[in-house]
A protein has these predicted regions:
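Short, cysteine/histidine-rich loop/knuckle motifs that typically chelate Zn2+
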Residues: 192
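Extended, low-polarity segments enriched in aliphatic/aromatic residues
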Residues: 1-189
Length: 193
């Protein structure tokens, strides 16, 4: 899927600022500046992407395309209070007391994942961005400011080791696809041209 409908108001602004929470995510490992833009996709399209993109890396490629489409001017990740474990729905609060900001959302996400104690470049969105040659490597990012040497050890989601697997049982997938996939309706006047 290379098309998505975005909220209309994006075109009303000269510059976009992405403000995300620092948290773990059972499907994507972590979620930060890039995944935050998923909120700009209209309505049921979000569910459609989740149902059709069952592999972490496939969904991550959509997030890379979405980020490149919106291109925020500034990306801020709020880690003053963050989330670890089974985020974003059932995680636990962590007082990380950190804010990450960058003009490059991928760089912000790499630094965030690294600070959380994750293999930053193995996270699906980072891996997709690296594969598409759209992002820099962690070692090439210069970090400045207070807390630049701060390191945390966030509890990882239970899915962390299986980031290449699908995340929903097949019967739920089938049910969801049936409900959210449009089907053509043939008009009785159709002459099969």
């Amino acid at each position: 899927i290379k098309q998505f409908e975005l909220v209309d108001c994006l075109s009303d602004f000269d510059k976009i600022i992405s403000v995300a929470k620092m948290k773990t995510h059972v499907f994507m490992g972590v979620t930060g500046a890039v995944k935050n833009l998923f909120g700009c996709i209209v309505g049921t399209d979000k569910a459609r992407f989740h149902l059709r993109m069952q592999k972490h890396i496939d969904f991550a490629h959509v997030m890379v395309d979405l980020y490149q489409t919106i291109k925020p001017t500034l990306n801020i990740i709020d880690g003053i209070t963050a989330m670890e474990g089974q985020g974003p729905m059932s995680g636990d609060v962590v007082d990380a007391k950190i804010i990450i900001a960058s003009s490059d959302g991928f760089a912000a996400d790499l630094i965030m994942a690294d600070k959380m104690g994750f293999d930053a470049e193995a996270m699906p969105i980072a891996a997709a961005g690296i594969e598409e040659k759209r992002i820099v490597h962690l070692k090439d990012i210069k970090v400045v400011g207070d807390g630049k040497d701060e390191q945390f050890h966030f509890v990882k989601p239970h899915t962390y080791k299986s980031m290449q697997d699908t995340y929903l049982p097949k019967f739920i997938l089938k049910l969801g696809q049936n409900q959210l996939t449009s089907k053509p309706v043939i008009n009785k006047n159709c002459v099969a041209c």
